[in-house]
A protein has these predicted regions:
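Conserved helicase motor core of SF1/SF2 NTP-dependent helicases
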Residues: 1-172
């Protein structure tokens, strides 16, 4: 074996990386150090549980050029979203491919939108937020979704709702 490749190294623990690196003289880490860390129930001393790419980046938002390559183009996010993500997480180095600007959802302005929801003493679930999310999804479904391939109505299967707690996901 000449090379060990670790995909999603932004979620692969440093200890595991060191262990598998013994299998070959060369190691290639692929992934995003800004990605959410792996889920772990155990507690280990630092930096054992730290992700390999996080350890390698040593606090930088992006890897310094001498340590690796930064893929500076996203094909997933429109420019409005990529600019925010780039500023917050990628040292303003991330750009959206022009093809992403063609993606539109009829009647909804591209970008980030804040919806304030009043509630009190919620912890891992919020019925108020769940109702708001459901209302927004129902409103979006059926609208004209335009992509590089053409346009069609937005389908419920096109929508992904992410929440920080499984209890909230189940509620939604």
């Amino acid at each position: 074996l000449d090379l060990v490749v670790i995909d999603e190294a932004g979620q692969f623990a440093l200890a595991d990386t060191i262990a598998v690196s013994q299998a070959a003289p060369r190691l290639l880490l692929l992934g995003d150090p800004q990605q959410l860390p792996q889920v772990s129930q155990a507690r280990h001393p630092a930096p054992v549980q730290q992700a390999a790419l996080d350890w390698l980046s040593d606090g930088h938002d992006t890897l310094p050029p001498e340590l690796g390559y930064f893929l500076d183009t996203t094909y997933r996010m429109r420019p409005e979203l990529a600019a925010v993500s780039s500023h917050l997480s990628y040292d303003d180095r991330l750009d959206a491919n022009p093809c992403t600007a063609k993606r539109t959802l009829e009647g909804i302005e591209p970008g980030l939108h804040t919806v304030l929801v009043e509630h009190d003493r919620n912890r891992t679930t919020s019925i108020e937020e769940a109702r708001t999310v459901l209302r927004l999804v129902v409103d979006a479904v059926g609208r004209s979704w335009v992509t590089e391939e053409g346009d069609r109505p937005l389908d419920p299967a096109d929508v992904l709702v992410v929440a920080p707690y499984n209890a909230q996901v189940n509620l939604i």
